Each structure stands twice: as structure tokens, then as C-alpha cells.
């Protein structure tokens, strides 16, 4: 990298003055330009021509011919599946990094919250409160499923799954995890200090994805944190739910496309699942006519688990760590394998 050449960064994310200063103070060569308009054709061509680094929430990207100097795209989201088919990402000299790890703290808390709510029958008690109804058989019907002594299965042991495992450790739960490469239990992606499980210390057993059905049979709770790819589309179908332990609970914070909604509803109605929590859906916003809304043992939230007042600062922390690496010609954190989809 030329020690004198300007490094032109374009952000389509609105930055605070403090965030802007943090980025620009890294190196005298850095120049940041902020355009709030996320539509590529509304950003001047001369800006695109000189852009070397793009900080964006996407999903729309500029045409290949507009960005001859672009070398790196930093997405503010963990999931970049909506960008993967863009011709720009087929260029060998352009790499994209996601924000995996940046928002794990709040997502871990969300998962723990839903596990506790489900296990302690909170949906049933909230419904009774709305009806002003005292639950007379409370001792028998509201027996909790405690996390302590329970087995929790985490499907997808990336940054989110690892933070869930770390938080579960304090509750005394047995953690089973499933990932694609079980021979590499360590996490080489971005991990904020004191969070996650970078060294693979918080799971009790690790399963390859091919052995997922066997893992599910042992789990009182199952948490889905896999990325959406062609191979994970509708992963949780009738056959997969039928392999789950009777009376278990299911939480999805990944993508709605990984779950067959009809199969989930059948599992809830049959008692195979005692309850579930969904933060993501195949269609968002979730249509009012969706039968999911009517399930009494289902918690629905509007794709909110990653959000926090600190969310953008967390993304900028990651971007700065990656920018330091970029300046030193070191490998970046969270480089997305376009062929794999994550």
C-alpha cells in the first residue's frame, strides 16, 4: 500500500462526529465521506470512482464499472445473504466483511431472555393476566423447565452461538453445539473482549451438521443461529422437528428461511414443542394473516434481537479493528466466503 496515497472511505451510514473522528484519526491518509442516501445511483459517480472502502448497511451495491478502486466492503450487518448475488462480489479484488461478533452481547441476552420466558411459562401467565384470570392449577400447570441441569443445543456455533454458550455457562446448563467444521473449534472471527467463546471452552460436546438430528434428541432447548444459505434453507422441516425431544423449546434468531413455518406450527400444536420464540421470519413484516400470530405458546418479536443503543458504536469498533489490519496488509476479520454464503 502506498504510504502517501489517500485512502478514500465512503459511508452510507450516518456517523456521529466522534465516530468519524475515531476512524480518521487512525491514519493521515484516511478520508471519510458520508452519504446518507443508500441508493447507489443517487451518489455522485465521482465519489464512487475514488472509493476504496465502503461502509454500508446495504443491500444495494454500485455497478462494477462505477467503482474501479473499490477493494473492501464492510457491512454493518451479520447476515449479508441479500448481497451475495451482486456482480460486484464476484470480483476477485473486492472482499466483503460482515459484522459478526459486533452485536453478540445483546443477542445473547435476547436468547437467554426467551429461554427463561419459555421455560418459566411466561406466555401463559401473561395471557392469564390479560384475561384477569388467576391460574388455579398453577402448581401443576406452571412447573418451570430450569436452565440449570437442562441441555441446550446451539445449531450454528459462530459468534452469536458462542456468546449464548458463554452466558448459559453461568446458569449451569449443558451446552451441545453443532458447526460445519468440528475439527476447528476455535473462533478466528472478530470477538469483543470478554465476550463469546473464542477458544471453544463453553460447549460440552460439538457435533458436525450431519449429526444434528442425534444432537436434537438430547436437547431441552434448541437455539438456531446459522446463516441463511442454500444448504440451510428450510433446515428445520417436519423431519427435523420430529427428531426434537418431546416437550422441548425452540428459538430462532438466524433467518426465517431456515424454518418451515407449517412444520413448526404442527410441532407446537402436537406438543412435540412446548413453546418457541421467533425473532425472524420468511416474510418481514410478518403478515397479519399469518397463523403464527395465533399460536398461544409462541413468542413473536419484530427482528429486534440485534438492536441496541450501542449497536452502531459496536459496528464501528469492529470496522476500526479491521481498518487497522487493512492498513497493515493483514487479513481482515469476518471475510465472507461468497460461495458458502457466510
Residue ranges and their predicted role:
Residues 176:
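Conserved beta-strand positions in the Rossmann-like core of class I SAM-dependent methyltransferases
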Residues 4-6, 148-151, 247:
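Phosphate-coordination loops involved in phosphoryl transfer and adenosine-cofactor binding
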Residues 12, 57, 76, 225-228, ...:
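Short, well-ordered coil/turn residues at beta-beta hairpins
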Residues 127-163, 208:
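Glycine-rich NAD(P)-binding loop of Rossmann-like domains
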Residues 2, 95-110, 118, 124, ...:
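C-terminal helix-to-coil terminal segments
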Residues 1-53, 180-184, 192-193, 327:
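N-terminal glycine-/charge-rich "phosphate-binding" loop or analogous flexible N-terminal tail
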Amino acid at each position: 500500500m502506498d504510504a502517501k496515497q489517500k485512502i478514500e472511505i465512503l459511508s452510507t451510514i450516518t456517523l456521529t462526529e466522534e465516530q468519524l473522528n475515531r476512524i480518521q484519526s487512525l491514519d493521515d491518509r484516511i478520508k471519510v465521506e458520508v452519504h446518507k442516501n443508500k441508493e447507489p445511483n443517487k451518489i455522485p459517480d465521482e465519489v464512487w470512482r475514488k472509493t476504496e472502502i465502503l461502509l454500508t448497511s446495504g443491500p444495494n451495491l454500485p455497478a462494477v464499472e462505477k467503482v474501479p478502486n473499490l477493494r473492501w466492503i464492510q457491512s454493518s450487518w451479520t447476515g449479508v445473504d441479500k448481497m451475495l448475488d451482486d456482480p460486484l462480489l464476484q470480483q476477485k479484488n473486492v472482499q466483503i466483511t460482515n459484522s459478526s461478533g459486533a452485536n453478540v452481547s445483546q443477542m445473547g441476552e435476547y436468547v437467554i431472555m426467551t429461554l427463561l420466558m419459555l421455560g418459566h411459562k411466561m406466555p401463559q401467565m401473561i395471557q392469564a393476566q390479560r384475561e384477569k384470570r388467576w391460574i388455579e392449577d398453577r402448581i401443576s400447570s406452571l412447573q418451570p423447565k430450569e436452565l440449570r441441569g437442562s441441555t441446550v443445543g446451539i445449531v450454528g456455533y459462530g459468534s452469536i452461538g458462542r456468546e449464548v454458550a458463554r452466558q448459559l455457562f453461568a446458569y449451569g446448563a449443558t451446552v451441545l453445539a453443532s458447526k460445519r467444521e468440528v475439527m476447528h473449534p476455535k473462533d478466528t472471527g472478530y470477538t469483543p473482549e470478554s465476550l463469546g467463546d473464542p477458544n471453544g471452552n463453553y460447549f460440552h460436546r460439538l457435533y458436525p451438521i450431519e449429526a444434528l438430528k442425534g444432537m436434537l434428541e438430547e436437547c431441552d432447548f434448541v437455539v438456531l443461529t446459522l446463516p441463511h444459505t442454500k444448504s440451510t434453507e428450510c433446515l428445520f422441516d417436519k423431519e427435523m422437528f420430529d427428531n426434537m425431544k418431546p416437550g422441548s423449546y425452540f428459538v430462532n434468531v438466524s433467518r426465517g428461511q431456515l424454518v418451515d413455518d407449517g412444520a413448526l406450527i404442527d410441532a407446537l400444536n402436537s406438543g412435540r414443542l412446548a413453546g418457541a420464540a421467533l425473532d425472524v421470519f420468511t416474510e418481514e413484516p410478518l403478515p397479519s394473516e399469518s397463523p403464527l400470530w395465533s399460536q398461544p405458546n409462541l413468542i413473536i418479536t419484530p427482528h429486534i434481537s440485534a438492536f441496541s443503543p450501542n449497536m452502531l458504536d459496536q459496528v464501528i469498533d469492529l470496522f476500526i479493528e479491521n481498518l487497522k489490519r487493512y492498513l497493515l496488509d493483514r487479513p481482515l476479520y469476518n471475510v465472507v466466503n461468497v460461495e458458502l454464503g457466510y
